[in-house]
Protein backbone atom coordinates (compact mmCIF):
# COMPACT_ATOMS: atom_id res chain seq x y z
CA UNK A 1 0.00 0.00 0.00
CA UNK A 2 1.25 3.46 -0.91
CA UNK A 3 0.24 6.88 0.39
CA UNK A 4 -1.75 7.74 -2.72
CA UNK A 5 -3.71 4.50 -2.38
CA UNK A 6 -5.04 5.29 1.13
CA UNK A 7 -8.80 5.51 1.36
CA UNK A 8 -11.11 6.32 4.28
CA UNK A 9 -13.02 3.35 5.66
CA UNK A 10 -16.61 2.95 4.47
CA UNK A 11 -19.05 5.11 6.44
CA UNK A 12 -16.45 7.23 8.25
CA UNK A 13 -16.80 10.33 6.09
CA UNK A 14 -20.22 11.97 5.84
CA UNK A 15 -20.98 14.65 3.28
CA UNK A 16 -22.30 17.87 4.81
CA UNK A 17 -25.96 18.64 4.30
CA UNK A 18 -26.46 21.79 2.21
CA UNK A 19 -29.85 23.27 3.08
CA UNK A 20 -32.02 25.62 1.04
CA UNK A 21 -30.85 24.27 -2.31
CA UNK A 22 -34.09 23.21 -3.97
CA UNK A 23 -37.09 21.10 -3.05
CA UNK A 24 -35.69 17.84 -4.44
CA UNK A 25 -32.78 17.96 -1.98
CA UNK A 26 -35.21 17.25 0.87
CA UNK A 27 -34.04 20.36 2.69
CA UNK A 28 -35.15 23.16 0.40
CA UNK A 29 -37.56 26.06 1.00
CA UNK A 30 -37.67 26.25 4.82
CA UNK A 31 -34.29 24.48 5.25
CA UNK A 32 -35.57 22.03 7.87
CA UNK A 33 -36.80 24.80 10.18
CA UNK A 34 -40.55 24.31 9.72
CA UNK A 35 -42.90 27.28 9.20
CA UNK A 36 -42.32 30.74 10.72
CA UNK A 37 -42.11 31.23 14.48
CA UNK A 38 -39.26 32.05 16.81
CA UNK A 39 -37.23 28.95 16.00
CA UNK A 40 -37.40 29.62 12.27
CA UNK A 41 -35.75 33.05 12.56
CA UNK A 42 -32.03 33.70 12.41
CA UNK A 43 -30.64 33.83 15.93
CA UNK A 44 -34.01 32.54 17.09
CA UNK A 45 -34.65 30.13 19.92
CA UNK A 46 -35.47 30.34 23.59
CA UNK A 47 -32.90 30.63 26.37
CA UNK A 48 -32.03 27.56 28.44
CA UNK A 49 -34.57 27.06 31.23
CA UNK A 50 -37.38 28.92 29.42
CA UNK A 51 -40.68 27.03 29.69
CA UNK A 52 -42.93 28.99 27.36
CA UNK A 53 -43.91 31.67 29.86
CA UNK A 54 -44.82 29.24 32.64
CA UNK A 55 -42.88 29.88 35.86
CA UNK A 56 -39.65 27.89 35.34
CA UNK A 57 -38.69 25.04 37.66
CA UNK A 58 -35.62 26.80 39.07
CA UNK A 59 -37.84 29.71 40.15
CA UNK A 60 -40.56 27.48 41.60
CA UNK A 61 -38.10 25.85 43.99
CA UNK A 62 -37.09 27.67 47.20
CA UNK A 63 -33.68 29.26 47.64
CA UNK A 64 -31.42 27.42 50.05
CA UNK A 65 -28.19 28.17 51.88
CA UNK A 66 -25.55 30.76 51.25
CA UNK A 67 -21.93 31.03 50.15
CA UNK A 68 -19.56 31.45 53.05
CA UNK A 69 -17.02 34.12 52.06
CA UNK A 70 -14.56 32.84 54.68
CA UNK A 71 -14.50 29.23 53.40
CA UNK A 72 -11.02 27.73 53.14
CA UNK A 73 -10.42 25.12 50.45
CA UNK A 74 -7.50 22.89 51.40
CA UNK A 75 -5.51 20.81 48.91
CA UNK A 76 -5.98 17.21 50.10
CA UNK A 77 -3.18 14.63 50.27
CA UNK A 78 -3.73 11.07 51.51
CA UNK A 79 -1.16 8.97 53.40
CA UNK A 80 -0.79 6.37 50.63
CA UNK A 81 0.40 9.18 48.31
CA UNK A 82 3.25 10.02 50.71
CA UNK A 83 4.76 6.53 50.23
CA UNK A 84 6.33 7.70 46.95
CA UNK A 85 8.87 9.79 48.88
CA UNK A 86 12.10 8.31 50.25
CA UNK A 87 12.57 7.41 53.91
CA UNK A 88 13.46 10.41 56.09
CA UNK A 89 12.29 13.06 53.61
CA UNK A 90 10.93 16.33 54.97
CA UNK A 91 7.64 16.85 53.18
CA UNK A 92 6.60 20.49 52.76
CA UNK A 93 3.81 22.09 50.70
CA UNK A 94 6.46 23.39 48.27
CA UNK A 95 7.82 19.86 47.73
CA UNK A 96 4.31 18.50 47.12
CA UNK A 97 3.71 21.27 44.57
CA UNK A 98 6.94 20.77 42.62
CA UNK A 99 6.59 16.96 42.53
CA UNK A 100 3.05 17.35 41.15
CA UNK A 101 1.24 15.69 44.08
CA UNK A 102 -0.95 18.81 44.32
CA UNK A 103 -1.65 21.24 41.50
CA UNK A 104 -2.50 24.24 43.71
CA UNK A 105 -1.80 25.07 47.34
CA UNK A 106 -5.22 26.76 47.77
CA UNK A 107 -5.59 27.73 51.46
CA UNK A 108 -3.00 25.13 52.43
CA UNK A 109 -2.45 21.38 52.60
CA UNK A 110 -4.51 18.92 54.64
CA UNK A 111 -3.20 15.41 55.21
CA UNK A 112 -5.90 12.71 55.43
CA UNK A 113 -5.56 9.16 56.73
CA UNK A 114 -6.56 7.06 53.70
CA UNK A 115 -4.18 4.17 53.11
CA UNK A 116 -1.13 3.16 55.12
CA UNK A 117 2.22 4.89 55.56
CA UNK A 118 5.23 2.55 55.47
CA UNK A 119 8.01 5.15 55.73
CA UNK A 120 9.40 7.41 58.43
CA UNK A 121 8.71 10.95 57.21
CA UNK A 122 8.61 14.46 58.60
CA UNK A 123 5.42 16.02 57.28
CA UNK A 124 4.77 19.77 57.45
CA UNK A 125 1.23 20.80 56.53
CA UNK A 126 -1.48 23.25 57.50
CA UNK A 127 -3.89 20.61 58.84
CA UNK A 128 -3.91 16.91 59.73
CA UNK A 129 -6.79 14.55 60.38
CA UNK A 130 -6.52 12.66 63.68
CA UNK A 131 -6.00 9.31 61.91
CA UNK A 132 -3.29 10.77 59.64
CA UNK A 133 -1.39 12.27 62.57
CA UNK A 134 -1.56 8.95 64.42
CA UNK A 135 -0.38 6.94 61.38
CA UNK A 136 2.59 9.26 60.75
CA UNK A 137 3.73 8.96 64.37
CA UNK A 138 3.15 5.17 64.38
CA UNK A 139 5.47 4.90 61.34
CA UNK A 140 8.12 6.76 63.37
CA UNK A 141 7.74 10.12 61.63
CA UNK A 142 6.72 13.58 62.75
CA UNK A 143 3.74 15.75 61.87
CA UNK A 144 4.22 19.49 62.14
CA UNK A 145 1.46 22.09 61.73
CA UNK A 146 2.69 25.14 59.82
UniProtKB/Swiss-Prot annotation:
Transcription in keyword set: no
Record keywords: Ribonucleoprotein, Ribosomal protein, RNA-binding, rRNA-binding
InterPro entries per the UniProt record, alphabetical: Ribosomal_uL15, Ribosomal_uL15/eL18, Ribosomal_uL15/eL18_sf, Ribosomal_uL15_bac-type, Ribosomal_uL15_CS
Residue ranges of the region described as Disordered: 1-58
Skewed-composition ranges (Gly residues): 42-52
GO terms for cellular component: cytosolic large ribosomal subunit
Source organism superkingdom: Bacteria
Functional note: Binds to the 23S rRNA.
Assembly: Part of the 50S ribosomal subunit.
Family the UniProt entry places it in: Belongs to the universal ribosomal protein uL15 family.
Annotated protein name in UniProt: Large ribosomal subunit protein uL15
Gene field: rplO
Amino acid sequence: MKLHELKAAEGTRKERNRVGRGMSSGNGKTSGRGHKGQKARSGGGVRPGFEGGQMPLFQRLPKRGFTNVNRKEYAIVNLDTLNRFEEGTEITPELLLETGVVSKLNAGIKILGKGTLEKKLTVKAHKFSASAKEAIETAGGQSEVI
